[in-house]
Amino acid sequence: MKDWAEGRACRPVFPLRISIEADSLQDHESQHLLRTTQHALDDLNDFSAHHLRLQISPPANGSVAVDGQSTGGEGEEVALIIRLLPGTETKADLQAYAPILDVYYTPNQVPSSSSSTSSLATYIANTLRDMFAEEQAMIAYLLSTSSSPPERIPKALAPEVAESLAKWTTRSIKYSRTYHLTFSLFTPTATPSSWEIEKALEDHMKPLLESFSPISNFTIDTQVQLYAQPGVSGAILKKQDLSAFINAAEWPLSPSIGGHPTINFLIYIGDMSVEGGGTSWLIPQWGGVIIQPDITDLRPAILTFSNQLMSLLGAPSSHSLPLRLNTLIRVRSAGLLLKASGTMGSLARLTVALPSISIPQSVADGVATTLFHLGKACDGLGGIEGLENARIAEEAAEKAFFEKSMVGQVYFPDEHKVAVYLPLLGPVGVPLVMGVVKEVKAWRKRRRGL
């Protein structure tokens, strides 16, 4: 258990494979470009837990992208496909709905076999570094806030980056295999009493939720609340008033349904706006709010809710949707693995600090389950299977640590035991003490008589 907590049992490593399609180049040219680009990438990377590995995609069967998942020429998953295409200028174009990066190059940029550097290789390496910089920073931040060994903790992040990532962790809702989404319409009057939310969700939200299916499932419900008054009033809402806008005492917003986390998305009918501009805002780990005068067009609101959902689930803020989802898988896997490992360490330290504490069989079973799935999560780190095993391990670790019978013992110090048992020992102790005193007096009397 301590080995997991101290990072000796598993070293989180994310070797991302990137496939290069270079059909326009000869074999020796593409191989030389790959080696040159790989050297440039290695020189730029100073974080050993997250590194990019290039490979050439065989032109015979090529690489394809299916449902946002890339496969190399031999069916292996890759994080990104780079397609090298001849052009009149050097530029990169990342496709919005596929993990494919089109890199255009000029003929004079193809490196010769005798050259050790290449402007094209440098350009590709810098582009890849920028694309995965946010993911690398996320994983580095998770490691820096865990109990990993000092040699595995990356160098300190820039203050502004660390601050941004701290807000990211505060904003993101806890990972769950299933989330419940509640879409609510609140109006201060009797109108509108209905809205075309089903069609809007079907057209603009369901495609996003389907793309999340490897990571999480979603259930949805909707509601309309009439004569709803917000917690604050006024035409201009100050930023410090936004958290009080939700009238929790009167608005029927369930915090959870069926044991799964609930994410609330709320449209309020009114003419109010936020100080400084804007009519929507995000509430960390809760949901999003939009104020608009009518509901004639729900498309902008649903698109805003989609962006807020991505933010609440912890997805990075840039690049194409498939890359953001794959990054989320890797980051969530690392976070759950580190959290479960830390919980195991806390449980081990607890048993050492309180040697008299009894360990129920359910806790022992939970520890065994956690360690088993931690091992499987470490082996499959970065993939769907690794994420699922990390989730099971984290849930089992939390359940074992907060076992109610053990919690009661932890918060039952020796002073409380004395207070409980002393009244019971009093009736027994007094006759014993008096009997001892009587026997001592009798012994002393007999001794004087001698």
Question: What positions do the PLM features span?
Answer:
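Juxtamembrane extramembrane loops of integral membrane proteins
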Residues: M1-L94
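Membrane-proximal extracellular juxtamembrane segment immediately upstream
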Residues: R324-V418
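C-terminal membrane-proximal segments flanking the terminal transmembrane helix
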Residues: D67, G382, G386-L387, F401, ...
